[in-house]
Every structure is written in C-alpha cells, then in structure tokens.
Amino acid sequence: MKRALGLMLIVASVVAIAFTVGTAGAAPVQKQDTSLTGAGATFPFPLISKWIPAVGSAYGINVNYSPIGSGGGIAAITARTVDFGASDAPLSGDQLNACKGCVVVPWALSAISIPYNLPGISCVVRLTPNVLSSIYLGDITRWNDPKVTQNNGTCNLPDLKITPVYRSDNSGSSYAFTDYLSNVNATWKSKYGTGVNAQWPAGVGAKGSSGVAGVVSKTPGALTYVDIAYSLKNKLRIGWVQNRSGKFTSPGLRGIKAASTVLPRKITDFTQLKLVDPPKTAGPLAYPISTFTYVIAPTSSSKAADLRKFVYWAVTRGQTYGPPLLFQPLPLQVQAYAFREIKKIQS
C-alpha cells in the first residue's frame, strides 16, 4: 500500500504526442556513443517519451523511438534494423522463431479506453460487452438503439449514426481489443478472431493511436478503442465498460490494478500476461480491457550493456512516470519475470 501511495504522489506532466522523440538535449555522462534506436507500438509512446530524457540524464543513453505500430516494431527488430522493438501484442510462436533469439519483456501496463463523440451529451455512456461487440459487428448502428439506451436511461442518447473507428495498421491495440471481443462474443470469435490486423466488418480505419483518436474528435457519433493517454490528450469523453461482476468501470488506475490481481503469483512465460475480460474474482472495480505492452530485445547485441540498462531502468524507476499517464506500475511478480528476461540480453 505504501509503495502504491508513493508512486501516486509523483507528479509528471502529460506529454504531447509526436511522431519521433529523442534525447538530443540530454548531456551524456559517457564519452563513447551510447545510442539506442527503437520502433513499434504507439500505445506506450506517451510513457516512453517521458522515459527517454530521464534515462538520458541518468545514464547518458541516447534513445530514439519511432511509434510506427506494433506490427512495424516486430518487423523492425526481426530484421535487426533497430536495437529494440515494442509491441502491445505478445509475439506468436512463429514470430518468436523468426526473431531468432529475442526476449519479450513486459514494461508497461495500462488500458484500452472507449472514447466517443456525442455533442451535447454530458453523462458517461455505459457499454455492455454485447453492445460494444455488436457495434463493431455492425449490428447496432444508432446511438438510440434500445440495447444501448437500456443502460443509459438518463443520457437521452440521440438518433445519431454510430461510426466505429478501428486501426488500419498492424496494431497491438487491435490485438488486445479483438481479444476482448473474442472473449465476450462468440460470433466475433468465430468470424474474425484475435489479431493485429483484424478484418473489420463495420466502421472506418485510421492509422495509429493518434489517428483513431483524431477521427473520433472530429466525427459526431464516432467511437473507438485507444490507450487512455490518447483519449485524455484529445479531451474525449470515455465510456465505462461492464465487467464480469456486472459493474460498469472506467479505465483508471484502480480498475487496471484490480484486473491485474488475477495474474499467477509467479510468471514463467509472457503468454501468462493476459488481462482482458478478467473473471469475477478480479472484483467489481476491474476494468475489462487492461493490457500489458512489451519491449522486444535481441539476446545477442553489440549494445547489450546499454540495452539492459535502459530496459531495467524502464521496469524499475521508469514505472514512477506512469501513473499521471494512467499507466499502472508493474505488479511485483511481473517485474520479477522482467528481471529474469533482461539478464538474457548479452553481447
């Protein structure tokens, strides 16, 4: 409890979302070049962009990161065109084999929010799993559909077209969201399944987290799935999603932390780090679309010392930068698993 309260007291400002960020202004403490280049997920970019100047000041490591999407990050580290990749989707067996000696290290934990644009509606829209999945299936198309209004009696939802917005690029956020849809809707699971590049039966696509958030901000009636930091940056209203306890919850730190309580006491493989649609044992506060995001690093690297130092810093001191951006600090057993994997990064 003291650790959690201490973390919550750390003050950090929400950063502006850019395309690439580095530590050009940080003064290195070592004479030799200590640069690292990474690429991948847009989901953790608000947090990574806080880490970069901090780790530069602490260790003189100059990190440059391009948020090109999880699929791009996996491809880049597999081809070794970057020093590390980042993905919200855990690597499949085939992807791990193709990477030829990579470790997958959880380094951040947050939630997929459901922002929407309903002009003149000040109440919080509540979304059941059936309603949310039916919107993305194209079965619910109006905001005043009885299936939507029955849990939003005081909202006076308008007769307005619903425009579901999805990621058009290979996206780890899409992986987490479609994994959730597959858990709560048998039709979605059988027809579309889980993936970074799902076939969407309804809606419009946009590239990147900033892209989908931008479409929603400009389109009355639209909604999407995106990391909570992007919803906040775009000042979007965020829906509450019903969990297995029947409660409607928001993607805040309490909800993410509650969802993480269902994890095993000891993590032995990154495939165990699944938090979408947690069982009732997670409690009434659990947010049902919480997810980890990962750094992918080669076990053999000429920059192994700096890479280990950066990733270790990220999963320890770097966690203190998370709460203001609504990234929940890693649970202790996840941190312990990360330490074991980081040790595998060698020259």
Language-model segments: what does each one mean?
Residues 1-34:
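Short, low-complexity disordered leader/linker segments with a strong preference
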Residues 22-347:
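Flexible loop/hinge segments at secondary-structure junctions
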